[in-house]
Amino acid sequence: MTLARRWRKAIVAGAAAVMVAMTAAVPTIAHADPARHYYLELGGTGSAAPAPGCTGSYAFANQHLDGGIPVPVCYPASAGPWLNGHNQFPDPTAPSFDTSVREGYRNLLAAAEDTHRRDPGARLTIVGYSQGAQAADQVLQKIASGETGIPRSLVSGKLYSDPMQPGTGIWAKLPKGWSAFGFTSPGPGPEKFDGIPVRRFCIRTDGVCDATALSSIGGFLQQHPKYQRDGNVMTKTIAQDGGEGVVWYEP
């Protein structure tokens, strides 16, 4: 082997050794997993189910979470003595609407705080429907106040047929404190939640969120069940990011 060839082999071998050493010296860049997105869900009156499912309100919507993780929250979902959580009536043993809402509020807030504690970087969407929307509205107000330790920047809200909808909801139309038959008006909810994007969804003439005319009485029976159906409002909107205010739908 000529001297020139020996030098070429030595240079190639040396270069290869340097490249191997450099590769070994460069640390592997870790790619962090994307933040998880939890949907904390409180269902409507009469929709209670055994844990861990807790509610039947989101059976179709949860098929459209785009990788999100549903967190169903149990509560009575009742309006006793008129209706129990399993849509049976009358039931004199069922918790009243007011009692049910209070328990829904406590359980939903506890679920949000526990989820944040276990996964501090995760996004949380607070979701409520009908009676569940009232409790979810109040939970979002609590988080917006800064009293929970959950950063507002991680939170959003989806309220379907919210009775506290400003201006048009049944509780916006009845004075705060009005009470009868186990129902007490908390008054309207806020239009904005101090930086938390919260969107309300209402089908016109649904008397829960659109108590603006006599037609809302019959409209409640016709429109109120539609949100949770396959291909309807919830399935089309639950995974949408951001947005504020009220989204109206025609009957």
Q: Where in the sequence are the language-model features?
A:
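Short, solvent-exposed loop/edge-beta patches enriched in aromatic
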Residues: 23, 113-120
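Serine/threonine-rich low-complexity intrinsically disordered regions
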Residues: 2-8, 33, 51, 119, ...
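A short linear-motif detector with a strong N-terminal bias
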Residues: 11, 134-138, 177-181
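Alpha/beta-hydrolase fold nucleophile elbow
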Residues: 117-129
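Surface cap/lid and interfacial helix-loop subdomains adjacent to catalytic sites
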Residues: 33-114, 142-251
